[in-house]
C-alpha cells in the first residue's frame, strides 16, 4: 500500500485543487441481480460528523463493480461495528452471506485510524474473512476506503480490485480560451483535475504502465503531434510531429516503447519508438490504412485496425513487423480495439446494419458478444482487472462516458455537466 500511496501522492502534490464539475457514476442496469452484501455504516468515534462516509464509499465501490448489490441501510437487521457484534442468522435470512463492518477514529495528531472486518455469515458463520486498518490524513480518506474495497472485492471474487485506479478523458467545453481539456479523475469521477488545456483539439490519451505519464495527441502547433506528459511535474516531451497524421499512441506493457500511427509517407502505418533511444521502427507497410495499435500483454505483438481487406477490421502483427493475421470476421467493420491485460479477449467498436456498439471477442474461441446498446459508441478502454469497460457514446447533442461489464450485464453512465466527454482511458493499477 505504501508504494501505491507514493504513486497517488504525485497526483496530490501537483494537482492539489480540484477543478470543474465532476462526473459521477449513475447505474442504469444490472445491480439488482448482483450478489447481495451488507456494508454497515462505519462507526464514527469522533465529534460531529465524519469528514468522509467510509462505509458509503465501500458500498458504492462494490455496487459499481457490477458484482455486488449492497443492501439499503434501512433494511439492515442490525448495525454492528465489529465482527463480534454480527448476528449471522439475521443476515442469512435476507440472503446475505458476507457483511462489512468498520470504524473511523480521529487521532490527536489530526489523522484518522480506519479499520474494517469482512465477516462470513453463511459458510463459516462469524469467521473474519479479511480485515485491515490504515492510519491516514484527511486527504487519504477516500483512497483508504477504495483500498478496503479492493481487499474485500478480491477476497470474495478472487479478482484483484480496481477501485484505486483512475480514468483520463478529454472534455470539450462550450467556449472559452481553452475549450479542450485533458482531465484525470478517480475511477468513480471524484478528485478530478486538469492535466492540460488547449485552444485546439486533444485526443487519444494513453497511460504508461506505471501510471506516471500520459501520451496523447495535440493540435496546438497547427497540425497533429504526439506528446508524452509526466503527471508529477507536468513536463511534456514531443514524440512525433511529422507531416500529415500523428496519432493513436499506446505504451508497451513494460513502458519502454510507444506504438503509434503516422501517415508521413502517404497511407497510415504503424510505428514503434524506443523511448530510451528515440529510434523509430516502421511496423506495417503498403497502401492500406493501418492505425489504432494495442499491445498484447507479452509485448511481442500488436492488434490494430486495417482496411487492407476493404473495410476496417482488427489484425495482429509482430511488434517487429512482418505478415499480419486477421482477427475479426463478424460484423461489417470492427475498429479501435483494446486487448485485455491477460490477453484472453479484446474489446472493439463493432458496426453492423448501421449500429455502432462495443463488442467483446474471445481470442481463443473467436466468439463475439455485443456488450452495449447505446448510440454511436467509441473508444473502449478496459479496467486493469478485465471486469469493466469505459467508453464514450452520443447522448442528445453531445458525448458522455459509459460503463459496461465485460459480461454485458452491468451498465452505468458518467454524465458531465460542463461539456462533451470523449476518449476515456482507464489507468493501470496505481
Swiss-Prot record:
It is found in: Periplasm. Keywords: Cell cycle, Cell division, Periplasm, Signal. GO terms for cellular component: periplasmic space. SUPFAM superfamilies: TolB, N-terminal domain (SSF52964), Tricorn protease N-terminal domain (SSF69304). One of its GO terms (biological process) is cell division. Residues 1-21 form the signal peptide. It holds the Pfam family PD40. The keyword Phosphoprotein does not apply. The keyword Hydrolase does not apply. Part of the Tol-Pal system, which plays a role in outer membrane invagination during cell division and is important for maintaining outer membrane integrity. TolB occupies a key intermediary position in the Tol-Pal system because it communicates directly with both membrane-embedded components, Pal in the outer membrane and TolA in the inner membrane. Belongs to the TolB family. PANTHER family: PROTEIN TOLB, PROTEIN TOLB HOMOLOG. The Tol-Pal system is composed of five core proteins: the inner membrane proteins TolA, TolQ and TolR, the periplasmic protein TolB and the outer membrane protein Pal. They form a network linking the inner and outer membranes and the peptidoglycan layer. This is Tol-Pal system protein TolB. It comes from Serratia proteamaculans (strain 568).
